[in-house]
Amino acid sequence: MRTLGAMAVMLVVMGTAIFLPFLLRSRDILGGKTMTSHVISVVETSQLLVDNAVYNTMKRNLKKRGVLSPAQLLSFSKLPESTSGAISRAAEIMETSIQVMKREQSQFSTDALSADILATIANLSGCLPFMLPPRCPDTCLANKYRPITGVCNNRDHPRWGASNTALARWLPPVYEDGFSQPRGWNPNFLYHGFPLPPVREVTRHLIQVSNEAVTEDDQYSDFLPVWGQYIDHDIALTPQSTSTAAFWGGVDCQLTCENQNPCFPIQLPSNSSRTTACLPFYRSSAACGTGDQGALFGNLSAANPRQQMNGLTSFLDASTVYGSSPGVEKQLRNWSSSAGLLRVNTLHLDSGRAYLPFASAACAPEPGAPHANRTPCFLAGDGRASEVPALAAVHTLWLREHNRLATAFKAINTHWSANTAYQEARKVVGALHQIITMRDYIPKILGPDAFRQYVGPYEGYNPTVNPTVSNVFSTAAFRFGHATVHPLVRRLNTDFQDHTELPRLQLHDVFFRPWRLIQEGGLDPIVRGLLARPAKLQVQEQLMNEELTERLFVLSNVGTLDLASLNLQRGRDHGLPGYNEWREFCGLSRLDTGAELNKAIANRSMVNKIMELYKHADNIDVWLGGLAEKFLPGARTGPLFACIIGKQMKALRDGDRFWWENSHVFTDAQRQELEKHSLPRVICDNTGLTRVPVDAFRIGKFPQDFESCEEIPSMDLRLWRETFPQDDKCVFPEKVDNGNFVHCEESGKLVLVYSCFHGYKLQGQEQVTCTQNGWDSEPPVCKDVNECADLTHPPCHSSAKCKNTKGSFQCVCTDPYMLGEDEKTCIDSGRLPRASWVSIALGALLIGGLASLSWTVICRWTHADKKSTLLITERVTMESGFRKSQESGISPQKAEVQDAEQEPAYGSRVLLCE
C-alpha cells in the first residue's frame, strides 16, 4: 500500500513538473503578458522573412540588368508606387505572422486571441495606419477639387474608391482552404468531382490563334481597344507581391514549379516544346487585414477572406495623367511653372511638341545601343505607359492637353495661382475622360439595350453607391479587350497609307520600346494607324493572337509569357467564383449542360472543347465563359460581361461626388462646352493631324470619312473666366514657399486654402478668409518634414542610412552596396569597395617601393668592395656608340647595336647594379 502511495505521489510530482510550465505559459498567454512578447517576436521574424525575400529579389534583378525576361517586364509593369509598396509589404508581414502562429495552434488556444492581439500584429506589421478611417478636411476646397488619392470622395465612407484599398467583392471568393489558397493550388482538390484544367491547356485548346488567322473588325478602329486599355489603367492596378521569391525558403519563383507563396506557377503540359515545366507567376498582394491575416481570429475568419488591393483610385479621374498618390503627383508636376504645367521631356521633341518625361528605369534597348545610351521608360500617372507605343501615344496626348488648358486658363485668369491653374486643367481633363468613356466608348461595348438596362441616364450623385472597382470587373470582365488586340502595329503617312519608311511591326517588337516613338516618326504615324486601321474582331475560335499567348513581353530568346494563361491564373489567384455563379448574380440562367451552354455560346465545336476540358459547367473560369458568349446586338460583349461592365460603370458614375454632370462641379454653361469636346478634338489640338474622323472609335476610309479639324467642335474656354471683384484689402500672395494655394468662396466670402508640396507640413491656419479688415489671419508656412525621424515607420530599410533633404529624404548605402529598385534597400553590388581598390593600388606601390629599396641595399652591400656603378643604359649606350664611331669610323647606329649585344637590358631606363 505504501508502495502504491509513493508511486501516486511520484506521478503527481512528475505530472506537475511536466505540465506546470505549460499551464503557467498558457496562463500568461491568456493574461496577455507572454503572448504580447511572443507576437512581437513572431512579427519581427516574419519581417525578416519578407524583407530577405524582397532583398534577394532586388539582388537578382540587379544582376540581370541586361535584357529583362518577360516575367521581369511583367513585374516591372505592375511595380507599385511607394505607398502601394509599403502597404503590400505590411500586408505580407502581417500574413506571414499569422501563418507562423497558425503553425503553433497546437500550443495556443486560437479562441483566446483578442482584438488587442490582432491590433498589435496590425500595428507592428505596419498595416494599422492603412486600416483606420482617414480624417476628411472640412474646407471649401474639399468640394472644389477631388483629392489625388480619392480619399473622402464619399465623406461617410472615406475609403470608398480610394487608392490602395481592397477591390470590391460582389460575390464571396472561392478559396480552397476557405480564406486564402487559390483555386487550383492543390492538385488533388476536386471541383464537382474533377480537378480544374491547367490554364495553359485552356489557352492552347480554346483561346490561341495564329497571327495570320485573325479577323478584323469592320466597324471599329484600333483606337477602341487602346482606349479600353488606357481607361483600365485609369481605374485599376493590382500590385503583385513585393517579392518574386518564396517567403519560406527564399526559392526564386522563376526557378520553381511548386506552389510556395507568393509563387503560383503556370504548369505546362508534359509534351510542351519549352525547356521548362512551368511559367513563373506571382500572386497579387493581399490587402491589409485579409486572408491569412484574418483567418486565425474567430470573429473575422468567416467575413474576412483574402482580398486584393487596387493601387489606383477607382474613379474615372485621369489618374493616368496625374497619378493616384501625392508622391507620383509631385514627380509629374513642373513646380517652376507659374501656369501649373506638367513636366515634359527635356531631351526630345516631336516636331516641336512635348513628349512624356523619362522615368529613372531603363526600358528595352534599341538594337546595338550601348548600355549607357538606353532610352528610359516614360514617366506618367500610371507606370504601364511604355508597354506599347499606342498606349504611350495616348498618355502623351493628355499630357499635351493638360498643358494646353493650363496655359490658356492662366492667360484668361492672370490672378490664378499655379495650383489653381493646375487643378482647373486637371478637373477639365478628368471630365473629358469621363465623357469620352461613358458617351463614346461604353455604349459600343455593351450595345444600346444593355447600356439602357445597366447604366441608364444620370440622376445625380448617390452617396449610398460604392464606386470601388470590383474584383470580377478588374480581373475578368474588363479583360475582354485582350481579345480585340491586333497583332500588328500599323504606322501611316499623311495620306493615311502604309508608311514606306516605317513598316508594320509585330506586337512583340514594340513592348517597352519608347525609342520606337521617339526615333521613328513620333506620335502622328501611330495615331493615324489607330484611327484608320481596324481592331481585331473577337471571334469565338480566334480569341487571342499568338503575339499575346506566345510572345508577350519578349525581348530576347530568354523565356516568354502567355497573357491568356495569366488572366485565367489571376482569376484563380483572386478566388473568383465560376462562370455560372456570375450568370446567376446577373439574373441570367445557369447553364448546366452542353446544350444549355450552346444557347449562350452558339458554337457547338467550342462548347464541346469547353466541356471536354472542364468536365462540369460549374468549373468554367468566368473570364473564359464571358469571353466565349455570343455578342449582344450592337455590342462587343455577351450578356454576362455586359452586365458586369455596365454595373461597374454605373457605380463609377453615380458614386463619384466629382462626376462632371454633378451640379456643383461645373456651371451649366461649362457643362455645355464640355459636351462639345471629343477625342478627335484632343487629337487635332495636340498632334500634326489636320483631318480626323468625327468618331475616333469608328473605322473609316480616308479622305471621305474624315473631317477637317476646323470642323470639329471645341470648348470655349472663356466660360472659365472669373469675374468676382478682389478687395484691395485682401491681395493674393505672389507665391508660397514650398507650397501653393487655391481660392474659393464660402458664405459669400473669399477664402484662400493653403497646401504644401509633398514632403512639407503646414504650420498655421490651412484656410484664411477675407474680412473687412483684410485676411483674418497670417498665412501659414510650409516646413520641411524630417522623414528620417519617423522611427515607427522608417522610410529606409535598415540596411540603408536615411538622409533628410528638403521636401524629401534619401536612402544612402555604404560602398560597395547600392540602392535596389525600391530606392530604399541597400543591395550588394557584387564588386569590391572603392576603398579596396585604393588599398590594392597603394599596396602595390608600397611593395614596389620596398622591392626597389631592397634591391639597391643588396647591390650596395654585395659590391661594397668593388666599384659600383649605376648606369642609365640608354644614355651610356648612346655615349659609347658615339665614341666607337669616332674611333672606328662606323656610324653611331651600328656602334650602338654592337654595344647592345654586350650591354644588359638595352634600351631600359631601369637603374641597374653592375
From Swiss-Prot:
Matching entries from InterPro entries are given as: EGF-like_Ca-bd_dom, EGF-like_dom, EGF-type_Asp/Asn_hydroxyl_site, EGF_Ca-bd_CS, Haem_peroxidase_animal, Haem_peroxidase_sf, Haem_peroxidase_sf_animal, NOTCH1_EGF-like
According to its record, how does it sit in the membrane?
A: Single-pass type I membrane protein
Please tell me whether the keyword Protease is annotated for this protein: no
Q: Which residues are glycosylated?
A: N123, N271, N299, N334, N603
Cite the active-site annotation.
Answer: H233 (proton acceptor)
Pathway assignment reads: Hormone biosynthesis; thyroid hormone biosynthesis
Write down the chemical reaction(s) this protein catalyses.
2 iodide + H2O2 + 2 H(+) = diiodine + 2 H2O; [thyroglobulin]-L-tyrosine + iodide + H2O2 + H(+) = [thyroglobulin]-3-iodo-L-tyrosine + 2 H2O; [thyroglobulin]-3-iodo-L-tyrosine + iodide + H2O2 + H(+) = [thyroglobulin]-3,5-diiodo-L-tyrosine + 2 H2O; 2 [thyroglobulin]-3,5-diiodo-L-tyrosine + H2O2 = [thyroglobulin]-L-thyroxine + [thyroglobulin]-dehydroalanine + 2 H2O
Task: Fetch the PROSITE patterns from UniProt.
Answer: ASX_HYDROXYL, EGF_2, EGF_3, EGF_CA, PEROXIDASE_1, PEROXIDASE_3, SUSHI
Q: Which Cys pairs does UniProt list as disulfide-bonded?
A: C136-C152, C253-C263, C257-C278, C586-C643, C684-C709, C730-C770, C756-C782, C788-C802, C796-C811, C813-C826
Question: Membrane-crossing residues?
Answer: 835-859
Please give the cofactor(s) recorded in the UniProt entry for this protein.
Ca(2+); heme b
Short name of one Pfam family: An_peroxidase
Q: Under what name is this protein listed?
A: Thyroid peroxidase
**Provenance organism:** Rattus norvegicus (Rat)
What gene does the UniProt entry assign to this protein? Tpo
